[in-house]
Regions:
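Helix-breaking motifs and short loop linkers at transmembrane-helix boundaries and internal kinks
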Residues: 73, 94-96, 128
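Residue-level signature of mid-helix packing/kink "hotspots" within the transmembrane helices
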Residues: 54-63, 146-147
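Cytoplasmic helix-loop-helix junction between adjacent transmembrane helices
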Residues: 106-140
């Protein structure tokens, strides 16, 4: 393992910390209530359909995200994933209705696909002696973000 690439690995792992937040934010009751009010919905559970759009975006983009990552490079795939996550998070927070939120959530799924196709190979190449630990690090950062999210919301709300 070349130590000069450790900061790169940490940045890649940090992307998955953000991914953990993105995945769990729509499942938090406080957020559901706020978004239902923002979108003029009477039923808080209607927000769950927006969360399902994350999976749809992932399914749509997986067939081409991998080949694009191989062809254009992992760095560009990570940038596309990060940019899509920014659009997703800002779009969900400021969407005036469920249509815009659904589109933003599809972009969140696309972000996840692009990050997966670039980050997994990158961290296993950086930490090549311990590839199992390298991929477990991704799950670790997702889990830590999901663990901390309710506490962050409790402080803010």
């Amino acid at each position: 393992m070349d130590k000069k690439y450790i900061p790169s690995a940490l940045v890649l792992y940090l992307n998955y910390f953000i991914h953990g937040i993105g995945c769990s934010i729509l499942s938090q009751q406080v957020v559901k209530e706020m978004l239902a009010s923002q979108w003029g919905l009477k039923d808080v559970m209607a927000v769950t359909s927006i969360a399902a759009a994350l999976g749809l975006g992932r399914l749509i983009s997986l067939p081409f995200a991998g080949p694009l990552s191989d062809k254009l490079g992992r760095r560009l795939s990570v940038i596309i994933g990060c940019a899509s996550y920014v659009i997703f998070l800002v779009g969900i927070a400021f969407s005036p209705n469920t249509t815009i939120a659904y589109i933003a959530a599809v972009l969140g799924g696309i972000a996840n696909s692009f990050l997966d196709t670039a980050t997994y190979p990158a961290v296993t190449e950086i930490i090549y002696k311990y590839t199992g630990i390298a991929t477990m690090g991704i799950k670790f950062f997702i889990s830590v973000a999901q663990l901390l999210m309710p506490f962050f919301l409790g402080i803010v709300a």
